Amino acid sequence: MQEFYDPKNIESTIQQYWHENNTFTVTEDFSKEKYYCLSMLPYPSGNLHMGHVRNYTIGDVLSRYHRMLGKNVMQPIGWDAFGLPAERAALKNQTAPATWTYANIETMKKQLKQLGFSYDWSREITTCRPEYYRWEQWFFIQLYEKGLVYKKTSFVNWCSNDQTVLANEQVIDGCCWRCGAPIMLKDIPQWFLKITAYADQLLHDLDKLDGWPEQIKNMQRNWIGRSEGINITFQVIDMKETLTIYTTRPDTLMGVTYLSIAINHHLAQQAANNNRLLSDFIEHSRPTKLSEAEIVKVNRVKTGIFTGLYAIHPLTEEKLPIWVTNFVLMDYGTGAIMAVPGHDQRDWDFARQYNLPVKNIIRNIDGSKPTISGIIPEGILYNSGEFNGLRSLEASKIITDILVARGIGETKVNYRLRDWVISRQRYWGTPIPMMTLEDGTVVPTPVDQLPVILPEYLLINSISNPLKDDHLWMKTNYNNNIATRETDTFDTFMESSWYYARYTCPNYDQGMLDTTAANYWLPIDQYIGGIEHAIMHLMYFRFYHKLLRDAGMLTSDEPTIRILCQGMVLADSFYYISCTTGERIWVSPINVRVQRDEKGNIINAIDLQGHHLVYAGTIKMSKSKNNSIDPLTMVEKYGADTIRLFIMFASPVTMALEWRESGVEGANRFLKRLWKLTYDHIQRGKVIKLDLAAMSNDNKILRRELHQTIAKVTDDISRRYAFNTAIAALMEITNKLMHASYHSQQDRAIVQEALLAVVRMLYPFTPHLCFKLWQALNGEGDIDNAPWPIVDQLALVEDTNLIVIQINGRFRSKIIVPVSADKALIIERASKEKLVAKYLEGTKVQKIIYVPGKLLNLVLK
């Protein structure tokens, strides 16, 4: 063993050993408990960032830990390789998206290996490969034949910047989730997957997911948006037409003063035939320049026009005017609402603007009048005829029963969740395996012609889809008839919705999944990724799992037992204002010299060119703020183990982590100390076997502290996921070992036991260093196959107490006494201690303060 820690040499050698020996390659072993650990599929953007490193380090720590428990551990990796960024990069660099993507994969694969992650590389998946998406196309056809896929012309979210459709889940505050551009609605033909058919299952099965964060489950519950209400039929006067309205609050029916319908409601279209003003309003208000989120905003200017039609109130038989408005969505409920301006802000705003009547009908429980900002959940009805004095819930039930009995009401369950728009007007994606015949008939591609292979090396010359210009690819044959291929491609969330299952059998060519392998490994035991995926990926992959189950391929209901959402990685950020453009120029923290005050706060910052900088605080690492730290630069400087240790130590894994190179240096110093401690221990020569019966009191104390550490670290990793406190405990016991006695063979034997345990417990965090230390300590076999240390319960039993001795409240000495020692014996023993006895000479003890088992304080006169 060399004297000084040299991570560069150590890490590359051990990584090569793992590669040559296929150390982390696994197969199904039904004699072992399995453990499937998975980090979310990365997009091959070109280089790893610290967010990647944090995510994958967490997964690797858990994988290595469970492998040491004797489990059959699978930790695979792959690439979410389709997507718009590749098209943008290809357009910018005048290359094919495939060229850019495959080059990035090779770069990132090399970087992952440099960090020492224990992946089973034999299971690597690349989603843009035909051998992967072939089965996605096949499954799509199965779903189409089951009626779970359909195509329709619909208003959909359209990103004008990326020239493609977005699912509702991909629109955030009216903007594209990827590029941030404002979203508009566009009426175009799209392919949909019937996720609404599984809405109840997706909702109810959340209650089974005890290992999921409550925040994610609540986000999904809210997105699914199940509501129980009633469809009420309003008769339109002088027409055979009726208007059906869905409401969850039938108790407010007596407060309705007008009805609102969406501009694309069939009744609006019908009324517009003989009403030029209405026709012009509908044409002007079509939601082509607004997203759905913008349409329903409470503070948006509300406009409308009277249709000239009236409906009859189902209980009072009053005439209710029907208005076409710009804030009612056709795709939610029935596209019509009953307006209760006395108890709804939006309805009140509209009523005030158009001088429509307002009727208050519900008071607070205490009798006070509520605000108009929203309907109160429970109140008392008044101004409501026969329902006066009833509470809201009771009134809702009675009114519902009356309407149902009269045949003008039907109880109904509605969902906020919409069917998933899975088609995209992009090139770099999985081709949708459908074709259109000359007579307009749309048919699936015959299964024996799958996969429909995407021509990989088309150049992108504009924002348009080059598939539409590739006539050789577009034209095909179907049963000797000319057919045209679908040029839309799948939403890339399709690929990432089932990759986890394909990892169980990546090379299986007889079907989508090998059911034996898939049902051995699934569900995932631990899934790791960001909470930003809560209502996109995490919803879709739950849905896909149920589809695979219902297709007979899986037996479990949910894809993963546990989810861990890691926090963001933050870093200092600095900028100056350009003298020429007035823009903010962001400067990398590694090129900044800072001055701090006595509390460590930054009070001045200058870059290498002499610009005086504005400190913008610690914010999420990003390219736009130029505050990303290259992981591989840090690995080159400190070694992978140091970076891994810092990442896991600097913060609880679910909290934000502030990048501090001073903290990295601290982690590196600790590893150097442990290396030197082990080196010095080995240099002292051969170690005898520890004789438990011959241990000194100091030996017993050190061994007890060791096994307390084993118990704590085990609990911190396995149950609490408190990796930072586990590392802190390992640092503490290491510090005690550095000050341990080496006077006897027994002393050295206890240090040997402790070092072997510490190295094994640190191994999941710093596997390269621990691999070498284990060898140097003559550990049995490779540490990759070593068992996790077991707590010796007898070592935890305390047969002695350490008593602190104080004189007049100041520390003077400490003594070790049997647990059974009483106060008198402790006073006697303390009085004989040299450091205590000299203070007692010629004085009298006025008072004795004794804390049993801990402290003796002698107060002198």
Swiss-Prot record:
PROSITE patterns reported in the protein's UniProt record: AA_TRNA_LIGASE_I
User: Which leading EC class covers this enzyme?
Assistant: ligase
Span-the-membrane segments of this chain are none
A Gene Ontology CC term for this entry? cytosol
Query: Pfam families recorded for this chain?
Result: Anticodon_1, tRNA-synt_1, tRNA-synt_1_2, tRNA-synt_1g
Report residues binding ATP. Answer: 623
Could you give a GO molecular-function term held by this entry?
aminoacyl-tRNA deacylase activity
Motif 'KMSKS' region: where in chain: 620-624
Cited InterPro entries: aa-tRNA-synth_I_CS, aa-tRNA-synth_Ia, Leu-tRNA-ligase, Leu_tRNA-synth_edit, M/V/L/I-tRNA-synth_anticd-bd, Methionyl/Leucyl_tRNA_Synth, Rossmann-like_a/b/a_fold, tRNAsynth_Ia_anticodon-bd
Q: Which reaction does it catalyse?
A: tRNA(Leu) + L-leucine + ATP = L-leucyl-tRNA(Leu) + AMP + diphosphate
| Alphabetized UniProt keyword annotations | Aminoacyl-tRNA synthetase, ATP-binding, Cytoplasm, Ligase, Nucleotide-binding, Protein biosynthesis
Tell me yes or no: is NAD among this UniProt entry's keywords. no
Chain location of the short sequence motif 'HIGH' region per the record: 42-52
One of its GO biological process terms is: leucyl-tRNA aminoacylation
Quote the subcellular location field of this record: Cytoplasm
Q: Does the keyword Aminoacyl-tRNA synthetase apply?
A: yes
Q: Quote the EC number.
A: 6.1.1.4
The source's superkingdom equals: Bacteria
Could you say which protein family the record assigns here?
Belongs to the class-I aminoacyl-tRNA synthetase family.
Listed PANTHER family: LEUCINE--TRNA LIGASE, MITOCHONDRIAL (PTHR43740:SF2), LEUCYL-TRNA SYNTHETASE (PTHR43740)
What name goes with this protein? Leucine--tRNA ligase
The organism named in the record is: Baumannia cicadellinicola subsp. Homalodisca coagulata
